[in-house]
Amino acid sequence: MVHHSGSIQSFKQQKGMNISKSEITKETSLKPSRRSLPCLAQSYAYSKSLSQSTSLFQSTESESQAPTSITLISTDKAEQVNTEENKNDSVLRCSFADLSDFCLALGKDKDYTDESEHATYDRSRLINDFVIKDKSEFKTKLSKNDMNYIASSGPLFKDGKKRIDYILVYRKTNIQYDKRNTFEKNLRAEGLMLEKEPAIASPDIMFIKIHIPWDTLCKYAERLNIRMPFRKKCYYTDGRSKSMGRMQTYFRRIKNWMAQNPMVLDKSAFPDLEESDCYTGPFSRARIHHFIINNKDTFFSNATRSRIVYHMLERTKYENGISKVGIRKLINNGSYIAAFPPHEGAYKSSQPIKTHGPQNNRHLLYERWARWGMWYKHQPLDLIRLYFGEKIGLYFAWLGWYTGMLIPAAIVGLCVFFYGLFTMNNSQVSQEICKATEVFMCPLCDKNCSLQRLNDSCIYAKVTYLFDNGGTVFFAIFMAIWATVFLEFWKRRRSILTYTWDLIEWEEEEETLRPQFEAKYYKMEIVNPITGKPEPHQPSSDKVTRLLVSVSGIFFMISLVITAVFGVVVYRLVVMEQFASFKWNFIKQYWQFATSAAAVCINFIIIMLLNLAYEKIAYLLTNLEYPRTESEWENSFALKMFLFQFVNLNSSIFYIAFFLGRFVGHPGKYNKLFDRWRLEECHPSGCLIDLCLQMGVIMFLKQIWNNFMELGYPLIQNWWSRHKIKRGIHDASIPQWENDWNLQPMNLHGLMDEYLEMVLQFGFTTIFVAAFPLAPLLALLNNIIEIRLDAYKFVTQWRRPLPARATDIGIWLGILEGIGILAVITNAFVIAITSDYIPRFVYEYKYGPCANHVEPSENCLKGYVNNSLSFFDLSELGMGKSGYCRYRDYRGPPWSSKPYEFTLQYWHILAARLAFIIVFEHLVFGIKSFIAYLIPDVPKGLHDRIRREKYLVQEMMYEAELEHLQQQRRKSGQPVHHEWP
């Protein structure tokens, strides 16, 4: 009998090939990485009869050896262990190919039939086919993992055997009988099993439970190129890796002596995450003998089964005609009202999890992740991925990474703020404004405004200094570098996750055409240069025409936003005179603050109202383009929504930052809108306080509104759904799928709203951070709540979403990089244009006491306020007063040769502003590019490991095929060759 250990070394010895030192390695010298989810099935113990058969394939001897070697034995030439000590642990040894033949036999078992034959098979036959010395030895107590598997297998058909993979819901009173009947008939013809059951609480509701059997799973897994495990991993180690391994061992021992980090999850609380380490390859029925199939029921994970069923639902016809296809169209026309995979059970248990363990993965996620008491803990990303799929897992991984990276940004921003707070009373500018009791400012409006003392702006000056001080430039540069570091290290983190979750080559293999695209362009086909198969094609002229229409719609919506901002500007101009003559003394005294606050609230209401229209218009424009794949559709829709909402949120902020008070003219010659309303001016301390107010209010109100819509609204809806259930029906009597039906569905656009909210927040945190250094702190506090709020929503308030796969966060990464570039430009303009940093700098080194480069005995900014205010003759205003008032500008006095013309200092400041913008941008962009160059997207060790695994996969596929051919020759009585025939 030829025995194969499954390693490259033994294979090459049989082949007479040379073996390099790098290939002589044992897996025990390295800690295995946890990569392939389908291997998770191997760590479970299954139901009683099934565990009896599968336990035959594992020996205690092989378990003690290197984890890559798979020692299996032949069923036709079984060898009994003849030692007395193995009496209670008898094991059969078979070859790798024999196990594959056994698994093939399962799929061809005559007792395993389709739905018409009740879809049952006699598992007892599997046990009787083997040599078993003592049947009593298999009566073992189920372990914690056993119970977890049984509980996590999800709801079942009435026979208690077939797992429910998907749920369809419709109303009995709906008249779309023919469409449903045709659709369900076609589903059965495709190999799915259906079972109908009426709702308990609502007699009008009917549920269709869907189960996908083994043969259908295999067929579609091959069609979709789903990667499945076929061999345990072996690892490459060199001298450096071994020395590093020893160092890690020493560090691990030292770490064990130290106190445990309270943020780290207790791994013992997640027994289901102990995965075997396997190589994976595209599934093929012709090469099924290559794959590790310990049990058919768990070979394909719940997420994979749901994805395959959904793929079939999306491509099954319900009427004659190429476009009459897909469950989504049936939901849109009312034939069905919902389609979703079921949750694995209740998320709460009457028994404490510490003593009785988790009832299912949903319960475990709630207790260890979604509860508010776990806000300080790391996220169980592997379990999130296992339950919700890789796409949602990547979202929470990115959100957690973003939140963690906000900690240093928030700390530095808080330090800048406290620096301004502690030095506020020592600010020369604030002191001069607060002491200017004899300086009168010109009226800020035409009718109801009067002269104001400069010291009336004392509070504004001190508050402005909190955000406009010496640390502003440093913080702007820091945040630009922070954004680059955040994105570059996220790319590395993403590459590690995609490798760990076996997503390296997924996009190339599994991306399929959208049914709508296929139905629209089925008459125009071209040969795909990659696959060599014909597929529908969208002509270039048609694509360009649709894109032009879509772009026109985008510009129209952006114009609508700008129009709304213009309306708010007009409102500010109209009401500022009304507030200046208001009866309430507080509003009359602080009329500028009241005008800004009211405008911010109105602007926020307009933002929320326009958002309702944006989503529908973006949806229509995206469908008009007919994207080729689902990822293209999601990227196009996400880009439109981002452009709409970004302009909607930030247009008013851009107005305040770069236009407010810039084009007002001067006393006696003010610029007016429509020759009627005088343009708004900044108060003597500048416009930065208006920008801070606008950002703070919008950021705060929007976060509250988003949190309410994400959690409060679903809570109210779910409460109302439960309230409508008939009285006298206990929750325990309602099946899981009916409880899921009473939950709210995940929105139609998936994670788009979640990403959009965070990306817009990232824009707030970086684009105008020079004006609002507390933005990272507010974002951090919000995200700590956001993670648990989203977790609670996914686990308890939403139906289980389709466990979709993804390799990255999609178009959002490019948008984040674009925001990082825009942030450098806007912060340069905010510092140079909006703040008074450049005028103070020019005065300090050109016009102030320190201009002569002599060691001064007084502050270099002494006299700055008086220098920054120009004079105007009150007699020219027609107010019946004489003397002079002051206004913010650099113009000549009335007694000069060129009164009210710009002075030389104005042009010096303008040149300094432009020079600062150029120097700042080039310096920061250079630093960002250098950092991005230093940080590779994929760690070198991971890159080498991926290349090594590709090589080993080819070798192992060759070895497995050779084993299979040898087994076939042995059965047919032909001589066994150790090389290819």
Swiss-Prot record:
GO annotation, biological process: calcium activated galactosylceramide scrambling; calcium activated phosphatidylcholine scrambling; chloride transmembrane transport; detection of mechanical stimulus; detection of temperature stimulus; establishment of localization in cell; monoatomic ion transmembrane transport
Record carries keyword Acetylation: no
Stretches of the chain found on the membrane's Extracellular side: 425-469, 572-592, 662-761, 832-914
Glycosylation sites: 425, 448, 455, 866
Cellular component aspect of the GO annotation: plasma membrane
Subunit and partners: Interacts with KCNT1/Slack.
Protein name as it appears in the record: Anoctamin-3
